[in-house]
Amino acid sequence: LEEQSFSFTKFSTDQQNLILQAHY
């Protein structure tokens, strides 16, 4: 369960990074 949560958090972070990269 913790691994899933970690993966989900990493996924969200990756998504935010993509949005930031696309913004610049």
Curated annotation (Swiss-Prot):
The portions of this protein that span the membrane are: none
What's a Gene Ontology MF term here?
A: carbohydrate binding
Task: Please provide the record's keywords in A-Z order.
Answer: Lectin
Q: Which domain of life is it from?
A: Eukaryota
Report the function annotation for this chain. Agglutinates erythrocytes of blood group A. Binds in decreasing order of affinity: N-acetyl-D-galactosamine, D-galactose, and D-galactosamine.
What family, per the record? Belongs to the leguminous lectin family.
Give the multimer and partner information.
Homotetramer.
Q: What is this protein called?
A: Lectin
Query: Organism source for this protein?
Result: Crotalaria pallida
